């Protein structure tokens, strides 16, 4: 007999605040569920916010002191002073769909693949991976994990 608590589902909050690019939110949800299983966080919670360049620039300035748009920003709630408040909440990922669209066009890949890559990238930051510390070994480790997860998600590598 199966017990109800064995089938706990992860909470994934997704909000699309931009209007320029149509995003399949159901597909995003399914892929995030799979990613959370792949990184052994199946019972964790995460939120995704899709915005335009203007909004991500405001967030980047407010929280990181960088006055320019970027492709993705992650906020980990599993480390730091608030990590014990709710250990089941991983954090938030904010993605600029404007920047993702431009990057996808430059890389000649579908926007959906670029969005999936940015979700993976943001999730890995939340999980403690880093590439911004001038450590080539950590950067290589993160890039390898990004490629691995993308392949497991899609069944093909992403060349960019």
From Swiss-Prot:
Instruction: Alphabetically list the UniProt keywords.
Output: Cytoplasm, Endonuclease, Hydrolase, Metal-binding, Nuclease, Ribosome biogenesis, rRNA processing, Zinc
Which residues are involved in binding Zn(2+)?
121, 125, 131
Under the heading InterPro entries, the entry gives:
MetalPrtase_cat_dom_sf_prd (IPR023091), YbeY (IPR002036), YbeY_CS (IPR020549)
> What is the free-text note on the cofactor?
Binds 1 zinc ion.
User: Which compartments is it annotated to reside in?
Assistant: Cytoplasm
The superkingdom of the source organism is: Bacteria
GO CC annotation: what is one?
A: cytoplasm
The EC class name is hydrolase
Q: What is its EC number?
A: 3.1.-.-
Chief location of this protein?
A: cytoplasm
Homology family = Belongs to the endoribonuclease YbeY family.
- What does it do? Single strand-specific metallo-endoribonuclease involved in late-stage 70S ribosome quality control and in maturation of the 3' terminus of the 16S rRNA.
Name of the protein in its database record: Endoribonuclease YbeY
Q: Which organism is it from?
A: Syntrophus aciditrophicus (strain SB)
Gene name linked to the record: ybeY
